[in-house]
Amino acid sequence: MSERDGGITVLYKGGRLASWHRLSAAEKKAYEQEHVDLMLAVAQQHRLQRLEGFRLLAPQGDYERFWAIDFPSLEGAEAWIRAEMAPPYGRYGYYEYYLARSGLPEYCVAWAPQAGGLVPQTGDPREVPVLDVDRNSVVVVMFERGEVGQVAGDKPVTEEYVAEMGAFCQEHGLLRLERFQLIAPQAEWHHVWLAEFAAFESAEAWVQLERGPGHGCLSERSFALTRKWAPAYFAGWTYKEES
């Protein structure tokens, strides 16, 4: 498996509760600024390596965004979760957190180019701009578990599956492929995949191909179609060496 060197990933299903929208504009602004200042301090103290959000095209109740957050240590991940839920801002959020390790199985490493680092937005991240999605791509988030009786996280594949998916990814210009394996597997999913395409049609076709039984992976799956959430802004949150 091709793994990131050490480190831990926080996977976060999040959103805002309805009670947030009953606050005044002044309260929202004050709570948001306090929250941003706190989170940026945690990011710097614990050497945040990545903060990437994906907004669901169709929210599922209070669950609106999926996040992948990388730290070099468990201590950083724990500190981030505590800070994110801290009041007053934290009272108005929806939180589901999972700890994971990232790494692709060898059979699919060549399906997508190595992702390059995103150029952060210029300016002070404490000054939050108007945030929006990046409409230049669609990211499929796939939650998957093996069939009954398999070891958690295992995914047996056939040669036919590898050949078919590899050809599809090349034809449709797969931009990025990542996998995260949960440290504590859930009843319905053991790992998460991110597959990014430039075209919505390609993302939709990838979902249908993964759902097919032809590759012999009788796995339980659920999918969410997303767009990257203000990627250049949040790239500016990562740890910076002090000069």
Task: State where each predicted segment sits.
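Short S/T/G/P-rich N-terminal loop/turn motif that feeds into the first structured element of a domain
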Residues: 1-63, 71-78, 100-190, 196-208, ...
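Solvent-exposed loop/turn segments connecting transmembrane beta-strands
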Residues: 86-87, 186
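Acidic-histidine catalytic/liganding microenvironments
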Residues: 45, 87, 213
